[in-house]
Amino acid sequence: KTISGTGVEGVISVQARQIVEETDWLLKMASENEFIKGVVGWLPLASDKIQSLLEKYAANTWLKGVRHVVQGEPDPEFILGTQFNRGISLLKEFQLVYDILIFEHQLPNTIRFVDQHPDQVFVLDHIAKPKIRMNEIQEWGKNLKELAKRENVSCKISGMVTEADYKYRTPERLQPYFDTVIEAFGPSRLLFGSDWPVCLVATGYKDWLSLVQMVFGGLSQEEQNQIFYQNAVRIYQL
């Protein structure tokens, strides 16, 4: 029902809880629902058992990537941790994308993290959650553009409305953030993301999709196709 009438033909389901059981459930849902084209799940990347877990889960063709909720880690250096990075270094062998979930203040450490893995494919989620409700853009924009210099990083356009209060959920207020993202990554490294169902605290799926379509309506049809499906198909090997 959520995507009916939107023209959306397929989605990627992304983890929310950091338990393997949720990854199992997402993979089961993908196998039973044709519109789910892939899963970004959670696995304990810092675990000593991560090699065997990756061997097991990567055998499931629905698994396209993994994500850790780094934004929720109390240790600001977590993303630079030895064990965590050992787990990240194994993903390329299994052709898995790593989705980066952080707050904007974690961008500097994220740049250092990405630099340790030049051959790993990364997708930055929610444009690194800038402080839209505070109308702050400079520091986030500077760090985002620095991260974007790493061509193995793409960026998911999502999560913006939940970072803004009701006054900043208009296209006009969000436009500078869209402009920064398109300047940093270009159409070839941007992906549309809904952040559903989290987005529902601020807007509906269809409303968010319509807003993003309107913002990028001035791009060529080929560029819009890249953002709304071609990049996802290529990056996640759908």
Give, region by region, the residue ranges found by the protein language model:
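A generic "structured core" feature
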Residues: 46, 82-83, 87, 123, ...
